[in-house]
Amino acid sequence: FYGLQTRYRDRNEGVERVGRILASELPESIKQYHLVEQSNNVPMVDTVIDADTFREHATYSVPESSVEDTYRRVSPTQQQVDAYEPHRATGAFFSTKFFWTQTFGNPEDFYLYQIGLLSSVGYKFNEHLGIYGGIRTTLLDNFDKFNFTVDAEEAFLPRVRTRVREYVTGPMITLDTVFMQWSDRLADNWYYQGYGGYLETMFGGVGGEIMYRPIDSNFAFGVDINYVKQRDPDSTTAFMDYSAVTGFASAYYQPDFLPDTRIRASVGQFLAKDRG
C-alpha cells in the first residue's frame, strides 16, 4: 500500500489503525503488510508489519504487547519504487495563503508591516518534474513611510539582503517565484533535487542538492550548491549584474531527548560571497 500518513502525529497510532483495518479485511494467508510512505511522489520508507504478530497484538493475545514489536521500517526496494503509480502524478494545482511581514524599531516608525496574499500555481509533468510559481498581492501595508531604500553607508560586502526595501515597495502585484524542479531518490537513503528559475524574491539561478538520510537515524547529511544572480527590483523578469556561487555542506541531528528539535550545522559560502 502506498500513501502518506498525516492524520496522527504519533507514528505508532497511525500504524496501528491501518494495521487493524488490514487485519480485519485481508485473509490470514497474507503474512506481511507493506506500507510505503512517499513524499513529493518519491517512496521514502517501507513499514513492514508482521501480520501474525500484529493480530496477536490487536486481539490482546500477548500480554503487555506493543505495536512497535509488530513492525520494522526499512528503505523501499527498487521493485517497490518501480511499482509506485501516484494517484495524480501530473496536472495543475493552485493554492492561496496569507503572508504577513513585519519589522520593529525602524527609523521611520517603530512598527512597519505588510499583509497580502501569496498565490501558488504550478504544473506537474510527472512524479519527478514540475514547474512552480508564486504571485504576491499586497493588500495592506505602511511601507510608504520609508524615506530611503538603501542607506548611504559604504558596505564592505556586496549588498544582497540589505536591499530588501527595494523589493517590498514595488507594485501591488509582483512575481515572487517561477522555477522548474526535478526531485528523485538516488539510492537507498540517498535523495537529490535540481532546480532553476526565479528561486525567490531577490535572486534567481540554478542549483541542486543531495541528501543522505538513513531510515530512523538521528543524523542526516546534505550538500547544496547554487549559481544565482540578483533580480532587478524595478523589473519583473530582469537581472542585475551581481552574481554569486553559494552553497553549504550541512549536518543534521535530532536528539532522542528532544524528539521535536532538529539541530543543524552548516559550512559554506553565502550570497555575499563571505564564508562561514
Question: What annotation goes with each model-predicted range?
Answer:
Residues 2-184, 237-245, 254:
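Outer-membrane beta-barrel initiation region
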Residues 5, 94-106, 119, 131-133, ...:
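Transmembrane beta-strand segments that form the barrel wall of outer-membrane beta-barrel proteins
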Residues 41-43, 102-108, 139-145, 188, ...:
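Gram-negative outer-membrane beta-barrel proteins
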Residues 211-214, 223-225:
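Conserved mixed alpha/beta catalytic, RNA-binding, or beta-rich assembly cores of soluble enzyme
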Residues 211-213, 241, 253-257:
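Short, conserved, surface-exposed binding loops centered on an aromatic residue
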Residues 223-236, 242-246:
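Histidine/lysine/aspartate-rich catalytic loop segments that bind and position anionic ligands
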